[in-house]
UniProtKB/Swiss-Prot annotation:
Kelch repeats lie at residues 143-189, 190-236. This is Putative F-box/kelch-repeat protein At5g03000. The keyword Repeat applies. It comes from Arabidopsis thaliana. Residues 37-86 form the F-box domain. It holds the Pfam family F-box. The keyword Chaperone does not apply. CDD domains: F-box_AtAFR-like (cd22152). Keywords: Kelch repeat, Repeat.
Amino acid sequence: MFCSCLEIVFFLAGRHHSQFPSLPDENETNKSSDSPPTVFSSLPDELILNCLARVSRFYRPSLSLVNKEFQSLIASPDLEATRSRIGVTENHLYVCLESNKNNPNPRWFTLAPIPKEQKVKPIIPSFPYQHPTSSTFVSIGSEIYIIGGFVKRKRSRRVLVLDCRSHQCRRLPNMALPRVSAAADVIDGKIYVVGGSKSKNIDNWGEVFDPETQTWEPIFPTTVDLTTQKSVFPGKLVMGGKVYDMDGLKVNLNLNSCVVEIDNMMCQISVCKGILVWYDSEEDLVWNKSMVFDRLGLDWTKEGKTEIWCAEISLERRGFGELWGFVEWSKKVFTYDGCDSPSDFFLHSAIVTY
């Protein structure tokens, strides 16, 4: 939808799509060209905004170069209000990277999903707080919640939220107990947090946060349909409101793997080895292994530089016990000086919708 709307916008602006770069350099974004009158000049602003609202946000820097009228409309808060009114949303991938070891505040980046030009761009301003290690991340709408973790080597009750619309970070009310590597899930608009504390008292088993009232309440094993496990992988082994016990399934979880739930299947993807390991909770109790990458080797470090690669993989069921993976695209999205392993700089990722 976004591509077709973009072509319509360029047509009405009196220019061809190929005349504009997908994402201009930063020094070009402040420039605007004086264009002759176009079809847009005779259209009401409401209709123009309705058209622009259907175009991906990542094309806005290019559209701002069309003329001063476009630049003004794109900067107007009415554009986001129009998107909200007509129900246009996009999924945005955010990643948190520690690319500078001398800076205790890591940077958040977002992936620009423009076809053939995918790249990671830093958000501004940078993260204002010291980033807790072993924290848990969940997202609701356009906000990413950062729950607990180690701060100055101590378990923390702190909860932060990053608003991905404004790129502003703020603190929320603290949890009742400090928690590290807790499991978390969003159920009916509320954030359930389980485990991660030293307490063995069942009264401290978990707690739930209500974003509407901004309050925490304790939860018990009978409050919601949840089951505990001895070692909870940070917020990843949560499916449909249940924390699944993987004990005995012989799955090795590490920082080079991504664990997600798709259609009631728990999928673990090994980034460096190009291997997909998956588990279907309805059909079997064993982990199955599938090869999903054409390229099985991946160089994270090269000649004193670190390269970050990103891939989009679509999964498809094909009969009993079969899961096929297709690499939609795969490319380098970010490079910085220094040779580190992925666990040294990659902290967290989250998908937000707005």
